[in-house]
């Protein structure tokens, strides 16, 4: 009986995926930025201008739409926007 109860608890925790968060780099001017823990429904974003000038890293609800002179990389794994 104890084994069955323990098995149910383990399966419940695995199914709920408790406490998962996303870790992204964040900065304003110069990479690499500091690490920020974002909610699991967020995405990591890295945005830069052509020629590599001015790189911005942050967490967002959605991927940014780049202007004609920008490049954007969005991803959903830890530290992927470095």
Swiss-Prot record:
Tissues expressed in: Expressed by the venom gland.
Alphabetical list of SUPFAM superfamilies matching this protein: Snake toxin-like
GO cellular component, one term: extracellular region
Descriptive protein name: Three-finger toxin MicTx3
UniProt keyword Iron present: no
CDD domains registered for this protein in UniProt: TFP_snake_toxin
Family: Belongs to the three-finger toxin family. Short-chain subfamily.
Keywords per UniProt: Disulfide bond, Secreted, Signal, Toxin
Known function: Has been described to inhibit nicotinic acetylcholine receptor (nAChR) alpha-7/CHRNA7 subunits and to bind acetylcholine binding protein (AChBP) (Kd=29.5 nM).
Positions of disulphide bridges: 24-44, 38-59, 63-74, 75-80
Signal peptide per UniProt: 1-21
Subcellular location: Secreted
Keyword Ion transport applies: no
GO molecular function, one term: toxin activity
Other remarks in the entry: Negative results: does not bind to interleukin-6 receptor (IL-6R). Probably does not inhibit trypsin. Directed evolution was applied to create MicTx3 mutants that inhibit IL-6R and trypsin.
